[in-house]
Amino acid sequence: MQQLTEIVEQALVIIDQASDLKALDDIRVDYLGKKGKITDMMKMMGSLSPEEKPAFGQAVNDAKQAIQQKLTERIDGLKSSELEAKLIAEKIDVTLPGRTQENGGLHPVTRTIERIETFFGELGFSVKQGPEIEDDFHNFDALNISEHHPARADHDTFYFNPKLMLRTQTSGVQIRTMETEKPPLRIISPGRVYRNDYDQTHTPMFHQVEGLLVDEHVNFAELKGILHDFLRNFFEEDLQVRFRPSYFPFTEPSAEVDVMGKNGKWLEVLGCGMVHPNVLRSVGIDPEKYSGFAFGMGVERLTMLRYGVNDLRAFFENDLRFLKQFK
């Protein structure tokens, strides 16, 4: 009995000294497990007389309960302490000011595309999209761009192979639309385009919006009127606008469109012209019956002019100090 009493006293002291749940579990195994000290004491009953066994068995059972109760109390105490420490660590000071969530804003390029889509949408133009990886027919051939035209050169175009490339303009969307839909057509095609160029006013990827109208009896005067109205609407000013004769393989006649800047100088903003008969023929449209006009504009350039941005690369650098100005 003396040995049993010593085991219990020793266990209670060790339990009080345990600092974590792992240590308590080790103590439980050491004293109450299958090979524990209390279990070993139970095995001694085989050597006792029948008269001694009841008292010894009761003593062992009391010892086991005492150790188990002490373990339970200590486990509950440690869990309570851990919870209290966790609550203190995670305590929220409700007197502190709240953290407001900043509202995001549209990127200036996105804003410009939306303004363009809204204006032309009110004139009955629908928005069309197309693949950014284009074949040479839709990117060049159908647009009346000859095999030896400089635009096809490796230093201007990103080629995957001689017949497949990153599109250099969204005009391919116009070709695909004319292949699948019959006139009358009024579409604009905004999207990313790619050219091998990088400096203060050029990036390898930029955004373009091109427009196309095909119908009977379409003329250049209609084109001029629409673009005049668009530019005055976009810049929200009664701008001076001029059309300069130019050359594009896919339009004839062709023109560059300029606006008068605040410094008194003309600034080029877009290109346009009447759709070349060869372009209409390439998609199975009779140029004797139908005519059309097309125009194209660089979104970043328009955005730079509207907001007074000097370096096009700022649109792609994700500098919040810059982007927050357009919220």
Swiss-Prot record:
Where does this one sit in the cell? Cytoplasm
According to the UniProt entry, what is the EC number of this protein? 6.1.1.20
Q: What class of enzyme is it?
A: ligase
* Superkingdom classification of source: Bacteria
- State the name under which the record lists this protein: Phenylalanine--tRNA ligase alpha subunit
GO cellular component terms, semicolon-separated: cytoplasm
Q: Which GO terms describe its molecular function?
A: ATP binding; magnesium ion binding; phenylalanine-tRNA ligase activity; tRNA binding
- Which PROSITE patterns does this chain map to? AA_TRNA_LIGASE_II (PS50862)
User: Partners and quaternary state?
Assistant: Tetramer of two alpha and two beta subunits.
* Cysteines joined through disulfide linkages: none
Q: What processes in GO biological process is this protein linked to?
A: phenylalanyl-tRNA aminoacylation
Is Transferase given among the entry's keywords? no
Give UniProt keywords alphabetically: Aminoacyl-tRNA synthetase, ATP-binding, Cytoplasm, Ligase, Magnesium, Metal-binding, Nucleotide-binding, Protein biosynthesis
InterPro entries referenced in this protein's UniProt entry, alphabetically:
aa-tRNA-synth_II, aa-tRNA-synth_II/BPL/LPL, Phe-tRNA-synth_IIc_asu, Phe-tRNA_ligase_II_N, Phe_tRNA_ligase_alpha1_bac, Phenylalanyl-tRNA_Synthase, tRNA-bd_arm
Instruction: Answer yes or no on keyword Aminoacyl-tRNA synthetase.
Output: yes
Could you tell me which species this protein originates from?
Shewanella sp. (strain W3-18-1)
Q: How is the cofactor bound?
A: Binds 2 magnesium ions per tetramer.
Q: Which gene carries the instructions for this protein?
A: pheS
Q: Please name the NCBIfam families in this protein's record.
A: pheS (TIGR00468)
- Which reaction does this chain catalyze? tRNA(Phe) + L-phenylalanine + ATP = L-phenylalanyl-tRNA(Phe) + AMP + diphosphate + H(+)
**Binding site residues for Mg(2+):** 252
Family affiliation: Belongs to the class-II aminoacyl-tRNA synthetase family. Phe-tRNA synthetase alpha subunit type 1 subfamily.
The protein's required cofactors: Mg(2+)
